[in-house]
Structures are given as structure tokens and as C-alpha cells.
UniProtKB/Swiss-Prot annotation:
Name of the protein: Uncharacterized protein C1orf198 homolog
InterPro entries per UniProt: DUF4706
Region of interest (Disordered), ranges: 1-21, 76-100, 133-177, 190-285
UniProt keywords, alphabetically: Acetylation, Cytoplasm, Phosphoprotein
Pfam families: DUF4706
Compositionally biased residues, Basic and acidic residues: 229-248
Superkingdom, taxonomy of origin: Eukaryota
Length: 325
């Protein structure tokens, strides 16, 4: 508010001292610009002094001539005009034409062209020197760059780490078929694992020892990790005399009576092996037991799919005891 009051007082003083009074438009303009800042108020006061100096002739001058008079009076005669020879003496870099300034290094005969004295351009040196002939020269190099390069000697692990996410398939192909086989076996094992995790798990691949361990609460390995019977045991069983087989055929009822306590195995056996059920009254000879063991091994080597729900409890049998003896 103080600056506004000072501007109004200055404008009143200028109006009273002038030969002609300011109109309402000029007064508002003078008041507004005088209230912006102290420097603006000083400029407006200097302009009023110039107008007072010229008197009534100031109103008859064209606006362009008024601006020229104001600029000349405000700057002062001491300011040098552009192109003044005194300026060239103070700034020797402005003497020579741009882009042709040569720099000499002391007393030695070393000269170079000043790169900063060149005319300004938005383009770089490579863009200014670009031509069609440079393209024709670079064509053979581009064609050689497009040719397949020999594989690098870096290890495969580092190549797989350096490969970007977009080029993952190319890095996998470079690792070779061994890696693909590894990945295939990995997914196969996962599929076998997930097969035995659901509520409708299949128990046809479980051995009696695995069933017993499940009843005890121990962790059972899946079928893909189970060790197959040794070839020596197979050969020994194959070399057994044929009279055992004949005894097995002669007494089918005894074998069915031994198999009766296993409900899951009774369902899995073919209908030809099922015989009339009866109470176990006679003791079983060891030869017949060995024959039954051979049948059990044959059943587990070639499993038949059995639909067993998870709610059923598989009972412990004598075969389980003999298997873990």
C-alpha cells in the first residue's frame, strides 16, 4: 500500500508540473506500472521527465519516435553501440570469421583449428558429414555383420544368465538335448508326484511294505523312486523247478484261500483265479507259499488298475509279514 501511495503522489506531481494534464487512460497506466516495483516506478518517473522536457510537442510525435527518444535518454550516451571498434579490442575472439580461428601453442610450431569458433548448428558432425556414398561403403560391413557368428567359448551357465527374458527360447536351444531330457524327466516326476496327492489317489502301485509304512504314518516314496527287484532275484525265481508250478495248478483252492484276507488283491486278480471260498482248515506247505509269492511278484511287476477310495483301510496280511521278514 505504501508503494501504491508513493506512485499516486508521483503521478500527481508530474501532472501538476506538466504543460498539459494526463488523460484518464494515461493516468491509470502510469499508476499501474509505478506500483509494480521500485525499478518500474523509477522508469515511469524518467519517462515523465522526458515528456516534460519536450512539452506539448511530445503529443504530436509518432509512437515509434517516442520510443526511440526514451531508449536514447534512458540508456545514456556512454553505452557503446553494436559493432563499435572498442568492443573488438576488448573481445579479440570476435575479430576473425567464425570457424576459421587457428590456435598456436606457445613458441612451438603446433597449431590447430579451434572447434568452439565454428558456427553454431543443431546438427552433429556425423550428421553434417552424412552422405549417400557413406552408406554404400558401409553396406559390405553390414552384410558381414549379418552372417552367423561362431559360438563363443563362454560356459553354458553364463550364457543362460546373460540371455534376456525375450530370448529365452534361443538360450534353451543352445544348451542341447541333454538339458531337454532333464526337463522332461523333471516334469514326469512331478506328474507322478501329483498323481498320489489328491483325494482319489491310486494305490495299485503300492507294495505291501509301502502299505505297512503308510499305516505307521511314515512317508512313502512314489512309484518313480521305487527300486525294481534285482535281476539276480528274477533269474533265481525263473530257475525254480517246474514241479512247483504243477503243484500250484493242482491246488488252486488252497491259493485262493490264502488270498482271501486281501480284498484289494482279490478285486485285482482275474476271474479265472477266483475259486470257491471256504474256511482255512489245512496248514499250507512251504512249497505252496513260495508259489504264492511268485504270483504276488508277478502281480506287482504288471499292476492292474484298481479303483480304491481313500476311505477304505487296507488290512495287514501274511504276505506283508513275509515281505518284511
Amino acid at each position: 500500500m505504501a508503494s501504491m501511495a508513493a506512485a499516486i503522489a508521483a503521478s500527481r506531481t508530474a501532472v501538476m508540473s506538466a504543460n498539459r494534464p494526463l488523460d484518464d487512460r494515461e493516468r491509470k497506466r502510469f499508476t499501474y506500472f509505478s506500483s509494480l516495483s521500485p525499478m518500474a516506478r523509477k522508469i515511469m518517473q524518467d519517462k515523465e521527465k522526458i515528456r516534460e522536457k519536450y512539452g506539448p510537442e511530445w503529443a504530436r510525435l509518432p509512437p515509434a519516435q517516442q520510443d526511440e527518444i526514451i531508449d536514447r535518454c534512458l540508456v545514456g550516451p556512454s553505452a557503446s553501440a553494436p559493432g563499435d571498434p572498442e568492443e573488438l579490442a576488448r573481445f579479440p575472439g570476435l575479430r576473425g570469421p567464425t570457424g576459421q580461428k587457428v590456435v598456436r601453442f606457445g613458441d612451438e610450431d603446433i597449431t590447430w583449428q579451434d572447434e568452439h569458433s565454428a558456427p553454431f548448428s543443431w546438427e552433429t558432425r556425423s550428421q553434417m558429414e552424412f552422405s549417400i556414398s557413406s552408406l554404400s561403403i558401409q553396406e559390405p560391413s553390414c552384410s558381414t555383420a549379418g552372417e552367423p557368428r561362431p559360438p563363443s567359448k563362454a560356459p553354458q551357465g553364463s550364457q543362460a544368465l546373460r540371455a534376456p527374458q525375450g530370448g529365452k527360447s534361443s538360450s534353451l536351444d543352445a544348451l542341447g538335448p541333454a538339458w531337454k531330457e532333464e526337463e522332461a524327466s523333471f516334469w514326469k516326476i512331478n506328474a507322478e508326484r501329483s498323481r498320489g496327492e489328491g483325494p482319489e489317489a491310486e494305490f495299485q502301485s503300492l507294495t505291501p511294505s509301502q502299505i505297512k509304512s503308510m499305516e505307521k504314518g511314515e512317508k512313502v516314496l512314489p512309484g518313480c523312486y521305487r527300486q525294481e527287484p534285482a535281476p539276480r532275484a528274477r533269474e533265481a525265481k525263473a530257475e525254480k523247478p517246474s514241479p512247483l508250478r504243477q503243484e500250484q495248478r493242482a491246488a488252486p483252492s488252497v491259493s485262493t484261500e490264502c488270498e482271501r484276507p486281501q480284498p484289494a488283491q482279490a478285486c485285482a486278480s482275474p476271474p479265472s483265479e477266483a475259486g470257491p471260498s471256504g474256511p482255512m482248515g489245512k496248514p499250507v506247505s512251504p512249497e505252496v507259499m513260495e508259489a504264492v509269492e511268485d504270483m504276488e511278484d508277478a502281480l506287482f511287476l504288471e499292476p492292474v488298475p484298481v479303483q480304491v477310495s481313500s476311505s477304505n483301510v487296507i488290512l495287514k496280511t501274511g504276505f506283508d509279514f513275509l515281505d518284511n521278514w
